[in-house]
Structure formats: structure tokens, C-alpha cells
A protein has these predicted regions:
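N-terminal low-complexity segments that are often proline-rich with Ser/Thr-Pro
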Residues: 169-191
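Glycine-rich anion-binding loops and their surrounding alpha/beta cores
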Residues: 1-173
Length: 191
């Protein structure tokens, strides 16, 4: 909170953008971390390894985003069980049409809130694609899903497009029917 105003005044990325995720007092063991420059990906993975992180994706997209981009290939350095690997997620392989990252830029609070509501209501757009990609990554590193090739992204995009205002819709189809059966067995009671 003390360095924020100074960082903002500088107008560029600094070491503080990197220190935050590495110095979390929560000692998170599974996480997706975006970095502003590809050169920091491997050093980040090594630092997380030293901190006994179990599974992490360190991400940077070719269009400069510090998250998984629906518009360009995203470089990923994965730390899993002490081993570091690299791979690329290509949105074309996931059936995502090309677009422009500038379309994801926030504007004012009203506009940003409108886009969030659109995602909740199930509108299929670049915002929902971006959210689905990054949620899928989070579920992969959490151990709840295997990888992007097992339909993880498509399952989460489906869930978002169904409108997450419906509690059943946030469960990907691979688990959707199982949840419906359990719900019927419990006479509609939520446990």
C-alpha cells in the first residue's frame, strides 16, 4: 500500500510487480501467475520451486498480456511436483477465433461492471473466452482438471455461456450430470 502511488507515478512495470506473488504470506502452493516479460518466467518457476510450490503456471502471451490470451499464443512455464516444463497454448487449437487484446481493456467502472454482468448472464464474447481460459488454468493447477487438451477450456466456456447465475451452470459438463444425479438423490437438498 505504501509503494503503490510511487509505482503508479513511474508508469512502468517494476520489480514490485514481481515481488508480490512471491512474497504472499498465504504461502500458496498452487497458482497461476502472469508476468509482464517472458524473461521472468523461468526465474519465477525456480523461485516457486524453492518455496515448495506444488503446481504453478507462469504465463506470458505473445501479445504482451500477463495472463492466458484468447488472441495470441501464450507461453507457459509449468512447475509441477518439483519439475519445470514449458509449453504453449495456441487459441487456434482451442477453436478460438482471432481478435484483439485491446478489446479486453477496461474503461470506467460502469463499463467494467457491464462486462462482468455480461459474463454472468452467459454472453459469449472475448471476455468470456478470456475468463474461461484463465479459470481452466486455475482448475488445472488446483488438481481438479488434467490439462487443456481434455476439454477443460471448452467445459468452462460452456459453463460461462450457460450463465453462472444458475448454480448448475458453473459445473462443467463432465461433472454436470453427476451433480444432477446427486441432487435428485438428495431430493434437491444442497449439501
Amino acid at each position: 500500500k505504501h509503494v503503490g502511488p510511487a509505482r503508479k507515478k513511474m508508469g512502468k512495470k517494476t520489480i514490485f510487480n514481481l515481488i508480490g506473488p512471491l512474497s504472499s504470506p498465504a504461502q500458496v502452493k498452487r497458482q497461476v501467475i502472469g508476468v509482464f516479460d517472458k524473461k521472468w518466467m523461468k526465474p519465477f518457476a525456480e523461485a516457486l520451486k524453492e518455496n515448495n510450490v506444488v503446481h504453478a503456471y507462469i504465463v506470458h502471451s505473445d501479445d504482451g498480456m500477463d495472463e492466458i490470451s484468447p488472441f495470441a499464443k501464450t507461453n507457459i512455464v509449468e512447475l509441477k511436483n518439483g519439475k519445470i516444463n514449458e509449453f504453449i497454448i495456441d487459441p487456434n487449437d482451442l477453436g478460438i477465433n482471432s481478435g484483439n487484446k485491446d478489446n479486453l481493456k477496461g474503461k470506467n467502472a460502469e463499463y467494467n461492471a457491464e462486462k462482468i454482468v455480461e459474463i454472468y448472464k452467459g454472453e459469449s464474447n472475448e471476455f468470456s473466452q478470456s475468463v474461461a481460459l484463465n479459470v481452466a488454468a486455475g482448475f488445472i493447477v488446483s488438481g481438479k482438471e488434467n490439462n487443456f487438451r481434455t476439454e477443460t477450456y471448452k467445459n468452462w466456456l460452456w459453463a460461462l455461456n450457460e450463465g453462472i447465475g444458475d448454480p448448475d451452470a458453473i459445473i462443467p459438463p463432465s461433472r454436470y450430470e453427476r451433480g444432477r444425479r446427486n441432487n435428485r438423490r438428495n431430493n434437491g437438498r444442497i449439501r
